[in-house]
């Protein structure tokens, strides 16, 4: 049985590879849209849509989809649109608690199996000056929340309560449990 990751995220690829999984990378192509409004439902729905999009082309394979967002001060924050948006996001997160949500979906069409789940991790951003925020804005345009705490030069996050791998993009504790229960 073949495992496919429906994502081109370097962080997800690295986390799964480090954990010893062998898989193909076939990213989902469609826009990320959902009708849900709550963060945990949004990430589960988007992860499922990504997994189904790829699984439709590879029905005998087990396909993994994932989606990450940041929730802070009542706002859902995805990837920044541009450098100005990244700076606006970083100002919102500055010196604040936020929650990082990642939804995971595992689908195998031929086996008629589908699992979904999500992880939520609380993070505290340190207080940074406008100069420091400008320095890091635009560095992480492909990441929800416009930051990458796994990078040594990213100084935004000072405290994590929960799964560090969730903040990076794939909650490995959840994924390992789900894939085992899935029978892979």
From Swiss-Prot:
Its main location: cytoplasm. The keyword Transferase does not apply. GO terms for molecular function: dTTP diphosphatase activity; UTP diphosphatase activity. Nucleoside triphosphate pyrophosphatase that hydrolyzes dTTP and UTP. May have a dual role in cell division arrest and in preventing the incorporation of modified nucleotides into cellular nucleic acids. Its EC number is 3.6.1.9. The active site is at 67 (proton acceptor). It is found in: Cytoplasm. Keywords: Cytoplasm, Hydrolase, Nucleotide metabolism. PANTHER family: BIFUNCTIONAL DTTP/UTP PYROPHOSPHATASE/METHYLTRANSFERASE PROTEIN-RELATED (PTHR43213), BIFUNCTIONAL DTTP_UTP PYROPHOSPHATASE_METHYLTRANSFERASE PROTEIN-RELATED (PTHR43213:SF5). Belongs to the Maf family. YhdE subfamily. InterPro entries: ITPase-like_fam, Maf-like. It comes from the Bacteria. It catalyses: dTTP + H2O = dTMP + diphosphate + H(+); UTP + H2O = UMP + diphosphate + H(+). Its cofactor is a divalent metal cation. The keyword Cytoplasm applies. This is dTTP/UTP pyrophosphatase. Pfam families: Maf (PF02545). One of its GO terms (cellular component) is cytoplasm. The record marks 11, 68, 150 as: Important for substrate specificity. One of its GO terms (biological process) is nucleotide metabolic process.
């Amino acid at each position: 049985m073949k495992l496919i990751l429906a994502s081109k995220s370097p962080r997800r690829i690295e986390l799964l590879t480090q954990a010893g999984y062998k898989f193909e990378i076939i990213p989902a192509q469609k826009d990320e849209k959902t009708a849900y409004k709550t963060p945990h439902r949004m990430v589960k729905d988007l992860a499922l849509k990504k997994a189904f999009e790829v699984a439709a082309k590879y029905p005998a394979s087990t396909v993994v989809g994932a989606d990450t967002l940041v929730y802070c001060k009542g706002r859902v924050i995805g990837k920044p649109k541009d450098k100005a948006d990244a700076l606006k996001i970083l100002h919102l997160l500055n010196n604040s608690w936020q929650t990082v949500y990642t939804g995971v979906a595992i689908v195998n069409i031929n086996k008629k199996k589908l699992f979904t789940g999500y992880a939520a991790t609380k993070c505290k951003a340190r207080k940074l000056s406008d100069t420091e925020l400008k320095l890091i804005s635009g560095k992480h345009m492909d990441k929800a929340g416009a930051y990458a705490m796994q990078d040594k030069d990213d100084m935004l996050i000072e405290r994590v309560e929960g799964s560090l791998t969730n903040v990076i993009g794939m909650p490995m504790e959840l994924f390992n449990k789900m894939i085992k229960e899935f029978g892979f």
